[in-house]
From Swiss-Prot:
Gene: ECM3
One of the Pfam families matching this protein, by short name: Mem_trans
Biased composition (Polar residues): 187-206, 213-226
Protein's recorded name: Protein ECM3
Species the sequence originates in: Saccharomyces cerevisiae (strain ATCC 204508 / S288c)
Described function: May be involved in cell wall organization and biogenesis.
InterPro entries: Ecm3-like, Mem_transp_PIN-like
Region Disordered, annotated ranges: 177-256, 345-366
GO BP annotation list: cell wall organization; transmembrane transport
Location in the cell: Endoplasmic reticulum membrane
Keywords from the named record: Cell wall biogenesis/degradation, Endoplasmic reticulum, Membrane, Phosphoprotein, Transmembrane, Transmembrane helix
Transmembrane segments: 10-30, 74-94, 106-126, 143-163, 432-452, 471-491, 546-566, 587-607
GO cellular component terms attached to this protein's record: cytoplasm; endoplasmic reticulum; endoplasmic reticulum membrane
Modified residues (Phosphoserine): 291, 338
Domain of life the protein comes from: Eukaryota
Length: 613
């Protein structure tokens, strides 16, 4: 056994942190330069979830897990349950004793319960398998162990509905049955006079005012607008993503927006009552009526105009041109990930809500090209595809609608929808990869088709004397290698968009205490749990030191960054007080600086004292 000095142990524990934070810093810089926009972040995140991470999971498990490792898999599952329960318990204590906003009482439980078990521990292990502390083979097996931890994390967050802790914090306007029955057609037929709090936002159509319209009686506003529009002969024909304002426009309107938002153009097309001059003025905040469902304060109105201007500009610019704009922030992240409107109803696809040129005709009807959808199109737009190809698009409505295609007598069982929802989430690419890889790894003669080890039987090889299916391992190894770097870059970009707003009085105490418990006290529990596993005879330091090491560091990981995506997905796009996002941002931003000290301290102690190196 190699013996190292304390200085060597400290350096071995600090060096991986340097690499990790350099990669996170790259993501942070790309975010600030607008190279990694929120749209690009989401696209890369979905690529990681659907391709890169499943390939990495399959490759590491098949290559490094044997049939005699079933006991280790069971220990990992048990450890995961204890880890999640401990974090949940600490969060519940903090929530009960210290001030926490009522609108984040579930979010703090999720933040305490679920750690970031994916890119961070894998990157850390891959920096320590150079032979100084662990061999390359031990490092590979450690990565496989982390992936099994990740599988347990996915089961608890998605399959078992852990995301509901976050969703329960959100209470939307008009939750009563009457308002929930409103449709886009209903909102289009609303009278033009402003009615406080009685407008549906799902249609994304704003009621407009002319500059002097505030002086016109409410009863004559409709005729006023109609009479004004009769004087113009110009009508909009085919919708376009952008619309340049006419030359004859005042400075105020010109300064307000260089181009017109897609939402405004869609409104013009569907009503056919707004002329070209009116369209050019839609982004001017003075034309917005007070009938918006959320009242405008000075701050919220400024933010709303800023978002409209950004939406207008980004709709007509190339991605390289967007780098000249200010860096995207938390409001842009909400705009991209938000899946609900103010009434809690799922936001419709931008294709149908914004009226893309290929979808809406000049008369506002749906193009025949969209109605003749192919099988591929139906698959792409199905709820199942949405669930399994993204990380923050599920909600309680997906649970309620699960099993709706089953026979009526089967739907009567209360657990049917939960069972179907559980199975749906098992179809996630990463979950499928782990399940398939474990089946292959536990059947020696099947595993021999992919890799050759001392425990696999001798079977006929390919012409190059390699296993017949080794090309699959080559593919998954090559593609999966990009998963961890991309994951850390996305982590840096996400942290770069977070902003600490006005916090709930006293909440900083709750956040600081919970972060201290998670990253300073819970690692002690992890070390004690490892010691208990050895004393119980389940593991030993000679053969299972990598599993014990992985178990220890998982107790010192920060909260999952998926928390910010889930919170954004349940936040309405035009929310003026995103309390949940502000609390989540503050809570996450406290943890990553502390990890620079806490994780190397834990690793140094574990190497010198527990492993006795």
């Amino acid at each position: 056994m190699t013996h190292i000095t304390l200085g060597q142990a400290i350096w071995a524990s600090v060096r991986p942190i340097i690499k990790i934070y350099l990669i996170i810093g790259v993501g942070f810089g790309l975010c600030k330069m607008n190279i990694l926009t929120v749209q690009a972040t989401r696209s890369i995140s979905d690529i990681v979830l659907t391709i890169l991470l499943p390939c990495l999971s399959f490759n590491k498990i098949v290559a490094n897990i044997e049939d005699n490792d079933i006991k280790d898999v069971g220990i990992i599952c048990l450890t995961s349950v204890i880890l999640f329960a401990t974090g949940l318990g600490f969060a519940f204590i903090v929530r009960s004793v210290l001030p926490v906003p009522k609108r984040w009482r579930g979010g703090i439980l999720a933040g305490g319960m679920f750690p970031n078990i994916s890119d961070l521990p894998i990157a850390y292990l891959q920096s320590m398998d150079q032979g100084f502390i662990f061999t390359e083979a031990e490092g590979e097996k450690g990565v496989a162990n982390v992936i099994i931890f990740l599988a347990m994390f996915l089961i608890c967050v998605f399959n078992l509905g852990g995301f509901r802790l976050i969703e329960n914090d959100f209470h939307y306007k008009g939750d009563d049955d009457e308002e929930n029955t409103l449709t886009n057609d209903d909102s289009a037929q609303q009278p033009t006079q402003p009615i406080e709090g009685n407008s549906s936002s799902s249609s994304n159509q704003d009621i407009l005012k002319e500059p002097n319209e505030s002086t016109v009686p409410n009863s004559s506003q409709a005729s006023y607008i109609s009479e004004k529009n009769k004087k113009e002969k110009t009508e909009l024909s085919v919708p376009k993503p952008t619309h340049t304002a006419p030359p004859a426009i005042d400075d105020r309107s010109s300064n307000s927006s260089a181009v017109v938002s897609i939402d405004s153009i869609t409104h013009s097309l569907r009503t056919n009552h707004v002329d070209a001059q009116s369209v050019s003025e839609l982004n001017d905040p003075t034309y917005r009526t007070r009938s918006q469902p959320i009242a405008y304060t000075t701050e919220s109105r400024t933010s709303h105009v800023h978002n409209n201007r950004r939406n207008s500009i980004t709709g007509s610019l190339r991605s390289i041109d967007m780098r000249e704009l200010p860096a995207e922030g938390m409001s842009d992240l909400i705009r991209e990930y938000s899946n609900v409107d103010q009434y809690g109803r799922r936001r419709k696809s931008s294709i149908s809500s914004q009226g893309a040129p290929s979808v809406l005709q000049a008369d506002g009807t749906i193009s025949p090209n969209l109605t003749r959808t192919s099988t591929l199109q139906r698959v792409k737009t199905s709820n199942l595809t949405r669930i399994i190809t993204s990380d923050a698009t599920v909600s309680k409505k997906d649970i309620e609608t699960s099993g709706s295609s089953l026979p009526k007598w089967l739907q009567k069982f209360p657990l049917t929808k939960f069972f179907v929802f559980f199975l749906k989430n098992c179809l996630r690419p990463c979950s499928m990869a782990v399940i398939l890889a474990l089946i292959i790894a536990f059947i020696p003669w099947v595993k021999a088709l992919f890799v050759t080890t001392s425990n696999t039987p001798k079977i006929k090889q390919a012409p190059d004397n390699a296993p017949a299916l080794t090309f699959i391992m080559d593919f998954t190894s090559y593609v999966g290698a990009a998963s961890v770097p991309f994951g850390l870059i996305l982590l840096g970009a996400t942290l770069g968009r977070l902003k600490i707003g006005k916090l709930y009085p006293g909440f900083w105490k709750s956040a600081v205490v919970l972060v201290f418990l998670r990253q300073c006290i819970m690692p002690i529990f992890g070390v004690l749990w490892c010691d208990r596993l050895v004393k119980a005879g389940w593991l030993n330091w000679e053969n299972d030191k990598m599993l014990l090491f992985v178990t220890a560091i998982t107790w010192n990981l920060p909260t999952m960054t998926t928390l910010i995506y889930f919170t954004a997905s349940y936040t309405p796009e035009d929310e003026t007080e995103p309390v949940q996002m502000e609390c989540t941002s503050f809570f996450l931003m406290l943890q990553y600086p502390l990890m620079v000290v806490s994780l190397p301290f834990l690793v140094s102690y574990f190497i010198k004292v527990q492993m006795k190196l």
